């Protein structure tokens, strides 16, 4: 319907920005054949999958502010990445690897944490699997802190989201 179309348009910039980040990851892969850029690529892909689930199952209607929080976080990451990207591409020395490694950690912590934050805010979440595929060991301490605040969703991400219904009662008005 018209309202859902407006919602999709409203959040299109978030998807656009994530795909832009993914494109930048692809452009850096040639210079870094080891797993660093692939890790970024997997992270961004997992974010897109999680957000697609939010749209597919109508979760935006229940907590639209959650996507706004993620959008702001991704914008911050994108802005912080732009000067780093120039530095990485211009300097062909060991500092290049250090900079990209730092960015991998930043993007993993920020985006994965934000997706966990979105999905943990919905009550009817089932069928979890380990989140460890999406985060490096360096990022794990921060994610553990984030996830500790989101019990009972402990160190897990949803693979499927089940909603009661077709007659879901609207959330209480604020």
Language-model features, listed with the residues they occupy:
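Intrinsically disordered, low-complexity Ser/Thr-rich segments densely containing proline-directed motifs
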Residues: 1-2, 174
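Extended cytosolic scaffolds built from alpha-helical repeats
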Residues: 3-100, 106-115, 120-125
């Amino acid at each position: 319907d018209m309202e859902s179309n407006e919602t999709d348009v409203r959040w299109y910039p978030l998807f656009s920005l994530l795909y832009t980040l993914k494109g930048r990851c692809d452009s850096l892969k040639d210079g870094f054949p080891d797993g660093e850029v692939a890790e970024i690529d997997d992270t961004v892909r997992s974010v897109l999958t999680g957000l697609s689930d939010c749209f597919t199952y109508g979760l935006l209607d229940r907590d639209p502010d959650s996507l706004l929080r993620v959008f702001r976080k991704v914008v911050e990451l994108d802005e912080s990445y732009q000067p780093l990207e120039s530095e990485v591409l211009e300097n062909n020395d060991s500092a290049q690897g250090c900079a990209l490694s730092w960015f991998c950690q930043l993007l993993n912590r920020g985006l994965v944490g934000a997706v966990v934050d979105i999905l943990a805010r919905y009550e009817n979440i089932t069928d979890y699997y380990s989140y460890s595929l999406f985060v490096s060991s360096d990022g794990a301490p921060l994610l553990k802190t984030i996830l500790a605040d989101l019990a009972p969703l402990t160190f897990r991400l949803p693979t499927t989201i089940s909603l009661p219904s077709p007659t879901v009662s609207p959330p209480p008005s604020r």
